[in-house]
UniProtKB/Swiss-Prot annotation:
UniProt-listed Enzyme Commission number(s): 2.5.1.3
Cofactor mode of binding and number, as noted: Binds 1 Mg(2+) ion per subunit.
UniProt keyword Transport, yes or no: no
Organism whose genome encodes this protein: Streptococcus pneumoniae (strain ATCC BAA-255 / R6)
Keywords: Magnesium, Metal-binding, Thiamine biosynthesis, Transferase
Database matches in CDD domains: TMP_TenI
Cofactor: Mg(2+)
Gene: thiE1
Entries under InterPro entries matching the protein: Aldolase_TIM, ThiamineP_synth_sf, ThiamineP_synth_TenI, TMP_synthase
UniProt: 2-[(2R,5Z)-2-carboxy-4-methylthiazol-5(2H)-ylidene]ethyl phosphate binding residues: T138, Q139, S140, G170, I190, S191
Lineage of the organism: Bacteria, Bacillati, Bacillota, Bacilli, Lactobacillales
PANTHER family reported in the protein's UniProt record: THIAMINE-PHOSPHATE PYROPHOSPHORYLASE, THIAMINE-PHOSPHATE SYNTHASE
SUPFAM superfamilies given in the database record: Thiamin phosphate synthase
Name of the protein in question: Thiamine-phosphate synthase 1
Gene Ontology CC annotations of this record: cytoplasm
Amino acid sequence: MFHKELLKLYFICGTTTCQGKNLYTVVEEALKGGITLFQFREKGESALEGLEKLELAIQIKELCKKYNVPFIVNDDIDLAMEIDADGVHVGQDDIGVDEIRKLMPDKIIGLSIRNEEEFQQSKVEYVDYVGVGPVFDTQSKDDAGGAIGYEGLELMRKLLPQMPLVAIGGIQTKHIKDIIKTNMDGVSIISAISYAKNIEKTVREMSEQ
């Protein structure tokens, strides 16, 4: 069962977005700090594939389970189904959410929506939450598109008054209070957590915002 409280502090990471640190250790520190949701996002030039990717996903899924934090897979529906992940998150150019819902009737499904145009072409009735952004410019995602700012978040809340919404894109600890004022249910963080010197402490500070 999906609750919007899960979106409060949503950590997204893979081996290509943790500055060469051990991903398992990074996620463990973030879990100790109090992240509420984790997304395994294994993308980029040096991303793991095949068996390596599968084995790491299983390890991190089990780690998340220990902390009662749902484990979401980015884009890779086959992997999510193979390891019985708690859900998937997809973008506008991936497989349709209506198709995913048929394959994964009881799982969490998240969808990225940037603006009104994307909203109009999205089948939001099939998803549990929407990721909105990028709020600010970001280096973590090559395909993120232009920043939408706080105004973009406010617009998405008007378009989707009842939908659980999580902001993403270039978010630092100092932004969280203002983002929550736009009626977002939480924030998605990549590099501000994974690049932190003390991940556990950084996550605690974020969750206190």
